[in-house]
Amino acid sequence: MILVNVHAGNCDNTLKNFKKKLQRELYFRKMKEQRYYEPKSVKRVRKAQEAARRKRKFARKRMYED
């Protein structure tokens, strides 16, 4: 459950904070994934591709750090 405090009736900043928290929690991605049924075989391939992408990104970061 995501909680956001409203200070002095400032709704604009509250909405910004709420959207940031939703993005940090990967809420939008989960909603998108659950919109349609995805077979386990397709889900497994997608997860493997995402892991490979993260691994390459981490390797690039390490290359520039050294």
Swiss-Prot record:
- Ranges annotated as biased composition (Basic residues): 53-66
Q: Which InterPro entries match?
A: Ribosomal_bS21, Ribosomal_bS21_sf
> In Gene Ontology terms, what is a biological process of this protein?
translation
For this record, the Gene Ontology CC terms, alphabetical, are: ribonucleoprotein complex; ribosome
Single Gene Ontology MF annotation: structural constituent of ribosome
Does the keyword Lipoprotein feature in the UniProt annotation? no
Asked if Ribonucleoprotein is a keyword of the record, the answer is: yes
The cross-references to HAMAP family, in alphabetical order and at most eight, read: Ribosomal_bS21
Which family is this sequence assigned to?
Belongs to the bacterial ribosomal protein bS21 family.
Recorded protein name is Small ribosomal subunit protein bS21
**What does UniProt list as this organism's lineage?**
Bacteria, Pseudomonadati, Pseudomonadota, Alphaproteobacteria, Rickettsiales
